Structures are given as C-alpha cells and as structure tokens.
Amino acid sequence: MQNSDSGSDSATSVALRTSTSAQAPVVQPVPASQQVQTVQHVYPAQVQYVEGDTVYTNGAIRTAYSYNAETQIYAPSSGSSYFDSQGGGAQVTTVVSSPTAIPSHSMVGITMDVSGSQIISSSGAYLIHGGLENSRHTPSHTSRTFPATLEMAIENLQKNEGITSHKSSLLNSHLQWLLDNYETAEGVSLPRSSLYNHYLRHCQDHKLDPVNAASFGKLIRSVFMGLRTRRLGTRGNSKYHYYGIRLKPDSPLNRIQEDAQYMAIRQQPIHQKQRYRPAQKIDGMGENPANSSQHASPEQSVAAQSQHHQQFIDTSHVFPDFPAPDLGSLLLPEGITMTDIKNLQLMYRRHCEATIDVVMNLQFQYIEKLWQAFWNSKPSSPDGSNPMSSEDEQEPIIPNEKLMVLCKYEPIMRWMRNCDHILYQALVEILIPDVLRPVPSTLTQAIRNFAKSLEGWLTNAMCDFPQQIVHAKVGVVSAFAQTLRRYTSLNHLAQAARAVLQNTSQINQMLSDLNRVDFANVQEQASWVCQCDEGMVQKLEQDFKLTLQQQSSLDQWANWLDNVVTQVLKPHEGSTSFPKAARQFLLKWSFYSSMVIRDLTLRSAASFGSFHLIRLLYDEYMFYLVEHRVAQATGETPIAVMGEFSDFASMSPVQMDKDDVSELGSDTEGDPHISGQPPVKRERVELNHSMQEM
C-alpha cells in the first residue's frame, strides 16, 4: 500500500490484490462465477498514520501516554479511560484497563471489527511503542499474585527468612512442586489446609521430610509473591484461604478424584461456594459416565467411594472455639514469654483445624503426617527467634526446645488437654452424627481401622517429648478411639436389630416368650443387689411389653429408652451425685436385663437369639444416653467424661488384692482435703493428685 501527499486529505480507495516478489503477474481467463470481486475499504478522515515512534493523527485525540526519548513501555496515565475522535463516520476507540503493566504471559492484542469500524484493545493488553526487545525494561505482572521462578523463590527465602544456601537447596524439590502444580488465578480461593494436605501427600510419595504448616506457608509466599489470604466461612467456622491461586489443569493431582472434588468446591467464585459439598462433575475426569466407570483407576474407585461416604458424615459441623489457658498465679518457665504462649495457641488451633479438614474428607492416613509435622517443628531462623509477621495470616513457629518447655508447664498441659477434648468430640460428631442411622459397612470399617491406629501414630510423633504430656494426650486419644469403636459397634447392632423389629412373626414370638418369664422371681433375686423401687421395676416391665406389642420401630424404642433415663435420673438433676447415680443406673439396668436373659435361656425360648441381640443394643444405647447426660450435667464433653474416668480406672489398682484396695480407700478417707468434698469433685481431685505424681 502506498501513501501519497494528496491521499492524506481525501478518502483513498485501496484494492486488495495478490502479487509475487519478482515476476510479472500471469493473466489467465477466469470464469465469471470464480472472478474475485474487487473489495474497497474506504477510511474516513480519522485514520491514523504511524511512522517510527511518533503518532500523527488528524483527529482531536488527547494524549494518553507520557513520552520519553528512551525506549520504554508506555502505560496508561490513569484507570479505565475511553478516548473518542471527533467527527462523524468511523470511530477509533482505545480501551485501557486498570492494570499498569503487561502480564508476562500475555501478548499485546488488538482486534478489529471492520463492520463497526472500531479498533478495540483487549482487556489487559497494551500498545507498546519503541523497541521492546532491546529495552532494558522487562514486562512485569502487576497483579498482586504472580509466580516466581525457582531461583527467585530461593533468593526470597534467603533474603526474607534468613535461610542458608545449603538449607534452601534442600527445598528445591518442594518449591519446584509448587511451581509445577499451582498457578495464579483471580477470583478463586484455596484453603490453606487443603494445599498442605497435597504437600503432605507429595512428601509421602517421594519419601521427603515435610516441613510444618507454618514453614510451608513461607515456601508458598516465596513462590507466589504478593499472595493474599482471606478468612472465609460462617461465623465460628471460618478458615484461612489462599486467594488467587489454584491447581493447574494439567497437574497430576487432578488424577486423584477426592482432591479434585474438594478443590472444585474451593475453586469456584466465592459467591457460588457451598461449604464442604462434593462437586457433581469434575473437569478432566471424563465426559461419559459409563466409560468412566468401566475404565476407572483404583484411585478413582476409592475416591468415588469416599464421595459416597461423605453423605453419611456431618460436613457442616461448627468447630467450637478453644478456651484461653488459665495460668493462675504461676510464673512462666524460664525463657518463655506471653508471646510464646499466644503463638502456641494460634499454632495449635490451626493444627486442629487442619485435622478437622482431613477427617471431613475421610483422608485418615494424613493424620499421622499432620502430627509428625506439628510435633517436630523447626526454628524459623538460625538463632531460634520467631518474629511474627505483620500479616495476620503468617503462621507462627515455636522451636522444639520451647515447645518441650511449654509441654512441661502445668497450665499448658491442662489447656491442651481441654482443647483435645473439644477437638475429638467434634471429630466424633462429624464421623458419627447419628449412631442409629444406617451407615455402609465400608465406612464403619474405615473408622474402626482409623481408631486402631491413633494411639500408635501419636506415640511415635511425640517420642521425644516428656512423658507427662505424652500420657495426657494419649489418654484423650485413647478415649476418642474407644468412643469410635463403641459407636460403630452400636451402629452395627442397630442395623441388625432394625431387621428384627420389623419382622412381625419374630415380634409375636418375643412377646409370647416374654410373657412366660417369672418377673416376680427376677425382682426377688435382683432386689437384694440393686435395691430398686418395686413400683418402678413393674412400670418398666409393663411399658416394655406394651412397646413390643405395638411393634414399634427402632426410633420409637430409642425414644422410650431416652424417657427411661430421664425418669430415673430426674431426682438427681442439679446434684453432685448425678454422675454416680447415672453409673449406678447402668449397673442395675445391666443386672436386670441379664436376669431376664437367664430366665429365657433356662426356658429354651425360641426367640432367645432376638432377645440377646435386642439386649446388647439397648445396653449399649443406654450407655450412650447416660454418658451424654453426665456430660451435660457436668458441663464437659462426652469425650472428657469418658477420658477422665478411663484415666482414673487405668491408674486405679484394678487387679490389686482386697487388702491393697482397702488400704487405698483408707488413705483417701484420711486426706482432709478430699474427704469433705462431693463425690464427683473428690474423684477429680484424686485424678489430679495421680497426674501430679506421674
């Protein structure tokens, strides 16, 4: 295209035609139907002509860019601006978006709409004048989050965190893993605990020693500089999220469906999220459900089963707040400050939140890694200091030396034990929200296997810590594991008994056999042991037969048992004797039911098997109801109630001779500080004395 002096003042007709570089065109006859119509584009007086670095225009377009003789990248002088040329006809419009530099991954793009005669620059794209290739300025991403190279990440760690070159070189694989699997993306968020779980899996698969959650946060910020965090979720159940990063589409982690499902929830725009609900469709997992099921990998099969199991747990559970440590008038240990105690509070709370997230996703195998990472935390700097960042999302790190000192401090031991009671009670309510609701046997078995491994995992993770704190924490974990075993057994019994209670012929046979039992003889034998009110026993007998005759469902039987507990324990409400009365009721209930089963056995009752199953279920459910009533009366969690008495039982000489037991009782009665206190408080004082002697 040639420009003439006269062509600048008038409209110019331009014909599009093909040409060769060195030969004259060869003209051949072409049929009329195939002839190319000459296309003319007429540009009005607003067309700009650009030569070199100077832009000339005959329209009244205001200057939007500052000019410098040096080669540079021009940026908009302000936010979004629109400049229209004067005059009618075609229009040239330049759209400038708010960012002030060129993204390193973007090309400068201009799109032309010939029909509309508009030139519009795409969002985030900029017109660059001058020689960019020879410029000493490099494009930079002005978004608050942008990825760094491996060298830049190591340099940031050395500069900002004081990590030596040798230590930073050991983190190369960790940093490279972040670069390979995550990328920046606006409008999405990722929970910190979820990203840390991915990291723990990576370390487990590649036999690497993981860093704790706080140090891992520093690694992330060294790779994704300017990373922001937000606290998302409902009040009392909010969690910190990294805002502006997501899993790469081609990341190997996408092949693991349970992670992809969890990430799909988090990687939606914030206003579209639904907390902890598994996604119905996962990108990259296959479009055809039939083909996906036929060619599913073992990981996908396990993930699909995990997704199915999540409907049976309570993923909306609100994690209660932890109490503050009660230091009383005790002096702090040497070298420990209040800042260290506050850091421990924050660090332990986030550790427990990560545990909750892992259990909610049924990833039980990561609990061991979480415990190992927490109880083997390393100093944040060579001198062991732990400066807190100005950002509220910065994870504090307590060196192992200080953590061991704090674990010997009595108020911290009590505080950590109380926090564990809250944590494990929340986990029980998440995994088994309803002990009578039908649950798949695979989920029940997974929970029982999880309970079986807990004590060993914690003992191994805390092998270097003082025995006082290890014993205290293992005691709570043992109560947690025992509760899971009891509740899963109760659930299994409930499903077996449900079939019996729905069978009319079996119910009729049970009622017939029960009417043959000599309850007067049962009461006569049991009265000497239990000393129960005869009227109460007769009323329970009549109510039991009536409920059985009505062919009540399992839920109706559960309501009846609950009413029995309420009726029996009502006289003791508000009294310090409530826990003791509740335990005595369990013993008496079990003794009476065993006497009835004995009579049915001697009579060779046809429904003996059904009665035996029902008896096991009702005894276990009574235990469940009573422990919750005692917890409610004492203001504790059921885990705390069971843990307290299980610890007391483990410290009590159960297998001792009678003389030793009586000697222990006489010692207790002789203590003036204990003998004058109520039974419940007396037991707690005895427990505290035993704890201090350990």
From Swiss-Prot:
Alphabetized PROSITE patterns for the sequence: RFX_DBD (PS51526)
Domain of life: Eukaryota
Keyword flag Signal: no
GO cellular component terms, semicolon-separated: cytoplasm; nucleus
GO biological process per UniProt: cilium assembly; neural tube closure; regulation of transcription by RNA polymerase II
Principal location listed in the UniProt entry: nucleus
Record's keyword terms, sorted: Cilium biogenesis/degradation, Cytoplasm, DNA-binding, Nucleus, Transcription, Transcription regulation
Biased composition (Low complexity): 300-310
Region (Disordered): 267-310, 658-694
Biased composition (Polar residues): 289-299
InterPro entries: DNA-bd_RFX, RFX-like, RFX1_trans_act, WH-like_DNA-bd_sf, WH_DNA-bd_sf
Keyword DNA-binding belongs to the record: yes
Tissue: Preferentially expressed in ciliated tissues, such as neural tube, gastrocoel roof plate, epidermal multiciliated cells, otic vesicles and kidneys.
Leader peptide range in chain numbering: none
Record feature DNA-binding region, as residue ranges: 174-249
Localization per Swiss-Prot or TrEMBL: Nucleus; Cytoplasm
GO MF term list: DNA-binding transcription factor activity; DNA-binding transcription factor activity, RNA polymerase II-specific; RNA polymerase II cis-regulatory region sequence-specific DNA binding
Positions of disulphide bridges: none
Classification via PANTHER family: DNA-BINDING PROTEIN RFX2, RFX TRANSCRIPTION FACTOR FAMILY
Subunit and interaction comment: Homodimer. Heterodimer; heterodimerizes with other rfx proteins.
Protein family according to the UniProt entry: Belongs to the RFX family.
Function description: Transcription factor that acts as a key regulator of ciliogenesis. Specifically regulates expression of genes required for cilium assembly and function. Recognizes and binds the X-box, a regulatory motif with DNA sequence 5'-GTNRCC(0-3N)RGYAAC-3' present on promoters. Required for neural tube closure and neural ciliogenesis.
Listed name of the protein: DNA-binding protein RFX2
Species, as recorded: Xenopus laevis (African clawed frog)
